[in-house]
Amino acid sequence: MKENIESKNIGNRKFIIELRYEPKVTMLDSKGALVEKIQETRVFPCTHWEIGQSEVVIRDDKKKEDAHNVVLVTLNRMSFISYKVDSVESFYASFSKVYEAVTKVLSSLTITRIGCRIIGTYNTKSNDLRMFLRTFKIRFLLNFY
């Protein structure tokens, strides 16, 4: 996976990879094992985890709003979210470790959908929307196409 967005171009990045798969009912009996296996990956310091009726949430802070890394596993979905990304490669490597841990516990998954989002904020020097769009087009879009 090529690093196609330089860190200097994006501030406050949020990366999300989400897998949807056919429901794995065995997940209900394996929630504790999921937490342990994901913690063993050491992709981030797991300081807080929650086990709900049909989900496991692991994050690097007790307060949801202060967390930089979050893993969510449900009956039919796995999400890996990070606000602290050094590169696309490092994010994908961390996701791969978490995915491997999940499949060790739940065995094979029949994936029905995969999605990836990168959300970022951009500093502006003008309040004028037309000026902003022109600048955005010049600085951002033309650099990647």
Predicted feature descriptions by range:
Residues 1-5, 113-145:
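Aromatic/basic-lined ligand-recognition segments
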Residues 1-82:
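N-terminal low-complexity, intrinsically disordered segments
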Residues 10-12, 74-77, 96-98, 121-125, ...:
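Generic ordered-secondary-structure signal
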Residues 25-27, 88, 124:
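Residue-level signal for secondary-structure boundary sites
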Residues 33-40, 93, 97, 104, ...:
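Charged/polar, solvent-exposed surface patches and flexible loops
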Residues 44-57, 104-123, 144-145:
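Short glycine-rich, low-complexity/disordered patches
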Residues 69-71, 92, 127-128:
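Short, conserved acidic/polar surface loops in the N-terminal third of protein domains
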Residues 74-120:
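Aromatic- and glycine-enriched beta-alpha-beta binding-site module
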